[in-house]
Amino acid sequence: MIYNLSFWRILRISIFIIFLFNFTYVCNIKYNVINKKNVSLVSDTLICREKRQKWWLWKTPSFLKRHSFSRIIKCCDKEQNNIGHFKKSICSLNYIPSFNLLLLLKKWEGLIKKKKNNHNFYEIAHNKITRNINSNWHLSGKGDINDYTKENDSNIYKDEEYNKNQYNDNKNDDTLNKDIVSIANSNLNNEMLHKYNIEQKNVRNFCILAHIDSGKSTLADRFLELTNTIKKKRMQDQFLDMMALERERGITIKLKAVRMNYKNYIFNLIDTPGHFDFYHEVKRSLNVCEGAILLIDGGKGIQAQTLNIFLEIKKHNIKIIPVINKIDLNTCIYDKICDDLVNKFDFKKEEILKISAKYGNNVENVFQRIITDIPYPPIKSNTFFRGVVFDSFYDQYKGVILIIKVLNGFLKKKQKIYFINSKKSYIIQEVGYLTPSMKPTDIIYQGDIAYISSNIRNFDDIEISETIINHDVVQINEQKKKIHINIKKSDFYNTLTNTDQHISNAINSDMDNPVSINFDNKENENLINIKETRCNPEYDLHYSDKKDVVMETNTIKEMSQIENSNIGTDKMHEKNEEFDEINIKDIAADKIDIAYPSVYCNIYSMNDKKCKELEVALNKLKLNDTSFSFKTDICETLGKGFKCGFNGLLHLNIIQERIKREYNVETIITAPSVNYLVKVKEKYIDKKLKAKLIEKNFDINSINIDVGNSESVKKEANETKTQNGMFFMTSNSNDIPQKNYIEHIYEPYVKTNIITPEEYQKHIMNECFKRRGIFIKKEHINDQIIFTFDMPLSEILINFLDEIKSSTKGFGSMSYENYIIYKQSDLYKIHIYINNKCIESLTFIAHKLNYQEKSKTLVSKLKSLINPHQFLIVIQAAIGSNVFVSEKIKPLKKNVTAKCYGGDITRRRKLLEKQNEGKKKMFTIGKVKLPPGIFTKLFNIKDK
């Protein structure tokens, strides 16, 4: 009992001492202010409400830290009487928040309840990003202010006997500074980036490029093994080829990014496809890498795609490491390939590495060359975040996942980002690295290849090569622009207080240092009147709706005079004309080259009920495939479908197969076609054709036309209607009018490279001339020849590569550039009729030199693919009304005379005549059923 009494006595004495200490501390500050010690130094800064009683200084650490006053606490502790130093500390932050939040009025006997109608604060909202927001707090490593205060604010208000409504009122007052406080301190950014720049010099971004079947995925497997990125239990061949189609066909379809750690280095590897139908994936990879491994098959040597890839790498001006793979083969021609690389590609012999990716021989040497030869990502001084999207995919839980390269700055969760092209804003939900599965992290830095998730569900908001920046940059730019315009319009300069001048000058001069102002000179100080000010929506410096006064004495009256701390200030905002606006488009990343579709066809769902599912599937596939495009199309026979663009027939087949496997939608595809440029004679334009032409109008300046007087043609085509006719572009042969309506048709040509052994050059020449190729040049590399032809795109789509392979016994290879030139051609529109009914989906365009051969081949294939019916089927090919090819499918036979085993012959004749009449009737009204996969078989869209 005695112990308890002594304990309570000691506790009471301790509480009294603490209270007395706080009371003395506050009274000391209050005494200096009330007795006008240095009042001229703070009179225009310490602004609060008028009260008849004494004042109380709010000094709760959580409150002050939340509003960036940690320096003020420190200064007050050291020099309690130096109010001038107190003000310098505020200004030296380059950040002046609402000062009503600094001083909270209280009665000496108790708290004054804060009523809404008595809310007469003089609020100064800065709305400008600051470079020194509470740097002491951040750099001390104690965490985020918001995280610290989130737990403590509610308890602080409760401890001060605020009720729930009062707490909410105070929280609403604090929202003025919420956005500003959340902006990262640029000094902190610089320190973080400086720390990371040391590590950034150990980052290497590179990709593996090669012709198909050269061992790219196998080399990537060895990289994963040697860096211990994947555990041995999980490791399997072609690990990065995660799609089932890739494993079945043994080809890479999509680029794959993976982050690996090797010793003290970070390797960001991108594995790319080798087939030229997916060449756009290679281009995207080169845009985000500082180096590339050029892999060559040791058994086959330099191939057509190897040459194209080398030229593409040279355009991007990045470091190339030549590597010869498959040296373990007995047929390896290492010396010959070395000579070709030295003579043709200007490599030095000591630069060329030889490895066996299958067995891992010499792969460690590749790592050393990556470290020494490939430069680290460029280090930029800009601290704001900027990144470029080079790939994306859809996750059913997280929405659209973006794969980006961080160009400068850093990005972390809960930051708000802005898409420059789509002008959309999102909040980051997750950031992380691909290892190769998604591994979340707290923050990503410049130079990193990483993924971000923002729960994006609208597919149209995202496009490849989109530039992402920190939303604060956009917000600050708009605020600076608004302040500049509003202050420029303002006639209110001379009535603003001295604090307003510091804010505006700091904003308009990119935050001049207010510490340089002489606050201690009190000679010849001017007197200004405190006038009634009301809220003006035009100003970015907001004023209270009530009357504002300045604390001067114990009792303050309206319209009283105070001393101005600055000398000779006649006009405020002298620097309001100086304003550097940030052009958001100027900070956008360079546009990534996008491969536009070269092959078009229509896709329809076999089940009309799944048309919506087909559209969703196409949207998701379009996310990570820049060369794939689609739009809605309506067909009379097949219903609603989609006109789709592809980069080749293999690309078409892959998309069709992915729709079937991943989205469970069976589809029908029409005949593949290319874009034709058509010029129509004006006198033959009817209303129907005119409506189509208006829909097809485009800027012909973006089209490369190979004609004698191309400039005059382009100038003529830019006008929608001219004396000679109109231009339009279409891939649908049904949109092309009759021959006599057309003045010219322009056909797309592409530059094609064919590499073959010298002994097969005659076969290659014959095949190219047969397909209307235009010879350009040929080059010799040892015993191989590189042919360059201008080939019609429509001719090389179907079976051309197969013919090259068969002509050269598998040693030849072919690739073409995705650069199209339109040449004038004599083309015919071929209609296919089945039982006198035109089948629009089978209509095609052919040249006058081979239209008969193509038509005969197509009709004979149709005859073999269509099953016999109970009536006669006639298949015809025609140009207009002129039928030049015809085939018949005989009807199924039924022995109607089998029951006539005797009697008069007239009975047998009557039964046969009745059968013939029925077949004639069925011929006119019967419908021919075409097999679902007829177009795939008809146009040889094979699984290559």
Curated annotation (Swiss-Prot):
InterPro entries xrefs: EF-4, EFG_III/V, EFG_V-like, LepA_C_sf, LepA_CTD, LepA_IV, P-loop_NTPase, Small_GTP-bd
Molecular functions per Gene Ontology: GTP binding; GTPase activity; ribosome binding
Entry superkingdom: Eukaryota
Binding residue positions for GTP: 210-217, 271-275, 325-328
Known EC number: 3.6.5.-
Keywords: GTP-binding, Hydrolase, Membrane, Mitochondrion, Mitochondrion inner membrane, Nucleotide-binding, Protein biosynthesis
Record flagged with keyword Mitochondrion: yes
Family matches, as CDD domains: EF4_II (cd03699), lepA_C (cd03709)
Membrane topology: Peripheral membrane protein
Chief site of localization: mitochondrion
Keyword Protein biosynthesis belongs to the record: yes
Reactions catalysed, as given in the entry: GTP + H2O = GDP + phosphate + H(+)
Annotated compartments: Mitochondrion inner membrane
Catalytic EC class: hydrolase
Domain tr-type G: 201-379
General function of this protein: Promotes mitochondrial protein synthesis. May act as a fidelity factor of the translation reaction, by catalyzing a one-codon backward translocation of tRNAs on improperly translocated ribosomes. Binds to mitochondrial ribosomes in a GTP-dependent manner.
Record family assignment: Belongs to the TRAFAC class translation factor GTPase superfamily. Classic translation factor GTPase family. LepA subfamily.
Record's protein name: Translation factor GUF1 homolog, mitochondrial
Organism for this UniProt entry: Plasmodium yoelii yoelii
